[in-house]
């Protein structure tokens, strides 16, 4: 793999890609996204922030396919045909680190740690590490994070760049395989709808810590499948959590 650095001064960004054989960016090394292209604000792009968007009619359709390490510090990944950022079949763990920026308005998940396109035959020995230190995942048609093959950590580093997973239509974080995990600390999960719940623990394990906020979602805030439990580890005074089991709802 190779290292890629995208900054506002070094690239024209990636926008409106059609009929490409793969995707917007296929990363097998290290991809540091500090920026892209600063577009003039318009009705189509009401922002002057860096953009990777409108990756359509490609083989896979996401803005970024990651098989290495993707570090996102700023910018927007939006409007892509199949997921904003997606891990694929790999023979080692891959890593997605969000320090800032926005993943929004994509068809499918904001981040898909699913080993697509063949999750049923992919080895369960390798997972995508998704570390949320800052930034926003919002308004995607699927989950904010589909963590079937994911190990998610939410640990907001600064109130100046908060972690927010909000207004996604397929829930916020979905855990569906025995090896999937989430350790959710300081950050906010709100305004999500659809799925079994904003944070849905169907399989795997879930730990809540710090000033985690899971509230204000449509339907369940925190869903636990029958027999599943959640670990509470040093919750802060600012923590806010609502829980739903298969038979009982707790506001």
What are these regions (language model features)?
Residues 1, 28, 93, 150, ...:
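Tight coil/turn sites that cap or link beta-strands
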Residues 1-21, 36-61, 73-85, 94-95, ...:
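Beta-strand-rich solenoid/repeat architectures in extracellular/passenger domains
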Residues 148, 202, 225-226, 245-247:
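Structural motif
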Residues 222:
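A motif-centric signal for short, conserved binding hotspots located
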């Amino acid at each position: 793999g190779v290292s890629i650095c995208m900054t506002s001064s070094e690239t024209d960004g990636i926008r409106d890609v059609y009929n490409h054989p793969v995707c917007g960016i296929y990363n097998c090394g290290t991809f540091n996204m500090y920026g892209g292209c600063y577009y003039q604000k318009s009705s189509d792009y009401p922002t002057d922030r860096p953009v990777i968007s409108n990756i359509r009619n490609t083989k896979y359709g996401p803005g970024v396919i990651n098989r290495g390490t993707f570090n996102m510090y700023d910018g927007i990944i939006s409007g892509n045909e199949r997921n904003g950022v997606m891990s694929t079949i790999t023979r080692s763990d891959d890593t997605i680190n969000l320090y800032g920026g926005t993943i929004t308005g994509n068809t499918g998940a904001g981040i898909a740690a699913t080993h697509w396109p063949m999750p049923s035959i992919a080895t369960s020995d390798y997972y995508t590490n998704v570390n949320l230190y800052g930034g926003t995942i919002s308004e995607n048609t699927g989950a904010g994070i589909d963590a079937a093959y994911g190990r998610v950590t939410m640990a907001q580093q600064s109130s100046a760049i908060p972690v927010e997973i909000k207004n996604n239509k397929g829930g916020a974080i979905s855990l569906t395989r025995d090896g999937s995990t989430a350790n959710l600390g300081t950050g906010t999960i709100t305004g999500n709808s659809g799925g079994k719940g904003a944070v849905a623990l169907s399989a795997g394990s879930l730990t809540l810590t710090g000033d985690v906020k899971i509230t204000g979602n449509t339907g369940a805030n925190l869903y636990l499948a029958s027999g599943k439990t959640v670990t509470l580890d040093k919750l802060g005074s600012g923590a806010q959590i609502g829980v739903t089991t298969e038979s009982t709802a707790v506001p």
